[in-house]
Amino acid sequence: MTTTAEKTDRPGKPGSSDTSGRVVRVTGPVVDVEFPRGSIPELFNALHAEITFESLAKTLTLEVAQHLGDNLVRTISLQPTDGLVRGVEVIDTGRSISVPVGEGVKGHVFNALGDCLDEPGYGEKFEHWSIHRKPPAFEELEPRTEMLETGLKVVDLLTPYVRGGKIALFGGAGVGKTVLIQEMINRIARNFGGTSVFAGVGERTREGNDLWVELAEANVLKDTALVFGQMDEPPGTRMRVALSALTMAEWFRDEQGQDVLLFIDNIFRFTQAGSEVSTLLGRMPSAVGYQPTLADEMGELQERITSTRGRSITSMQAVYVPADDYTDPAPATTFAHLDATTELSRAVFSKGIFPAVDPLASSSTILDPSVVGDEHYRVAQEVIRILQRYKDLQDIIAILGIDELSEEDKQLVNRARRIERFLSQNMMAAEQFTGQPGSTVPVKETIEAFDRLCKGDFDHVPEQAFFLIGGLDDLAKKAESLGAKL
């Protein structure tokens, strides 16, 4: 439940505590402020400074990061500090940064401070919640485990997602993480009518604009709130934008009792921004130059993403993997919090299989007979066994050729190639590029189709019939067009 300390006292933005200080030092986004003795603002308090730059008046928001002693506080600016000089008056608001919450945030774009970007001034009269909040108490957590059906074959069969869980999309640059997130927003809105909150953390501004346009064209913008802190923003903004979006999602969960989907693109940029802030604050770096507080900062975010009794926040997070190195501390720290991982592979991508999920590297904690059922588990394990054996045979095939394999292995390779192609699927997010409508396959049909495929029922069907299609009906049509019958 929400405590009064975590809400603002009234609608609108928090007001002043009538305590003012003055700027004594500006170093990029780091601003040192001196306050009167006995009036030092608390950590995470928001401070406001009125400045004029190039004839434009604006209000800078600073967040208290450190107490330096001698009545000095060190703050991080959430906007560019151009025009800020020594001696400028700084007002302590008496509260932390807060964002608007409520049904009205859907269909709009906000920044990390809660300012509406598509309609300036919108949302100022809404109730505001602090972005720094405690996770739900242990006794409030939902004990049941339930699968979230997506309609994507490769996900539902091999890496089933947990309702109210944390799911990560791992991959290097350009393998389709953002496209898969857009696909999930489409599917959740169309198939379940659920509320989605999207956090754009340190990614390209162009992608944010494209997402806004595509959601509007797909008629799902009305069910989605977007919060952006793009890569041209100061590190303080990129570090806080995920918390701002999560706070909006928590309102839908706690006050409306809804199941909410929270999309974060990209969680690596959250870590990267924290590293920049840590360096600016003069902290000693840890492994590979990351901040010493990496695990703590990640935990503060991830522990708030959870299910309470009867309602949930399901999180899907894109994770950029630097240089495709999974031992890097940023993706490695994220692993500890996840219920399912979907790894997008450059090798699969190069085959033209989309979504480019590596079925052998992806995993889920609920791929277990006690959760998904014996039949689902059996079929998934058989698919994995065939694909793993095919991978083991790759070197032999490359050196000696497929003709040197035993008849049993030849048959297995042929089935594995069909399975690989059948794991591809036409997606809603790619309709405008492919001209093919996206398909949704019920999990029961997915299990039946792959069970028959593993048993050899489709050995006579050409490989290309399995490529970028939906379920069994699509397979029958494609096979017939190629002169085969199921």
Curated annotation (Swiss-Prot):
Record InterPro entries: AAA+_ATPase (IPR003593), ATP-synt_VA_C (IPR055190), ATP_synth_F1_bsu (IPR005722), ATPase_a/bsu_AS (IPR020003), ATPase_alpha/beta_chains (IPR050053), ATPase_F1/V1/A1_a/bsu_N (IPR004100), ATPase_F1/V1/A1_a/bsu_N_sf (IPR036121), ATPase_F1/V1/A1_a/bsu_nucl-bd (IPR000194)
Broad class of enzyme this protein falls into: translocase
Molecular function terms from GO: ATP binding; ATP hydrolysis activity; proton-transporting ATP synthase activity, rotational mechanism
Main location: membrane
Disordered: region residues: 1-22
Localization per record: Cell membrane
Function: Produces ATP from ADP in the presence of a proton gradient across the membrane. The catalytic sites are hosted primarily by the beta subunits.
Protein name as catalogued: ATP synthase subunit beta
Organism classification: Bacteria, Bacillati, Actinomycetota, Actinomycetes, Mycobacteriales
